[in-house]
Amino acid sequence: MTRRFAHRLRCFLPVIVMGLLVTAEGCHSPFVQTIIDNQSDATLKLVEVDYPSASFGVETLAAHSKYHYRFKIQGSGTITLQFADASGKLQTSTGPELSEGQEGSLQIIIGRDRQVSWKPVLRTTK
């Protein structure tokens, strides 16, 4: 390696590194961080969240516990929650409209009276 080449490499290396960092920053997929928060005194069973184009869930969610999940919205539509309460009765709640490209957080709170509240903090990405 010649001195001239080594000098040019030292001069241009920071420019190359900055270019790679800017490119990497542009590679971002929008995800929704979700928490299902069971604030009731009973264990819930067959907890399922349906959102546009997919679903996720957990077989049981103990009283006063939380379930964390991250998903990507593909398509648009309403999100719903379904679970069986302690007596085995199926409960359903409809949440907010979701649109492809949204990201942020969503908290789904199941209260002591089995009432469900939805707390979305979502924004649309480019």
Task: Locate the predicted segments by residue.
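Sec-dependent bacterial lipoprotein signal peptides
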Residues: 1-25
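Bacterial signal peptide processing site
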Residues: 26-30
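Asparagine-centered strand-capping/turn motif at beta-strand->loop junctions
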Residues: 34-41
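Short acidic/proline- and small/hydrophobic-mixed sequence motifs that coincide with surface turns
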Residues: 42-46, 91
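Intrinsically disordered, low-complexity Pro/Gly/Ser/Thr-rich segments with frequent PxxP/GP/PP motifs
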Residues: 53-75
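A short, solvent-exposed beta-strand micro-motif common in secreted/extracellular proteins
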Residues: 76-87
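Extracellular beta-sheet/turn segments enriched in Thr/Pro/Gly and aliphatic residues
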Residues: 95-126
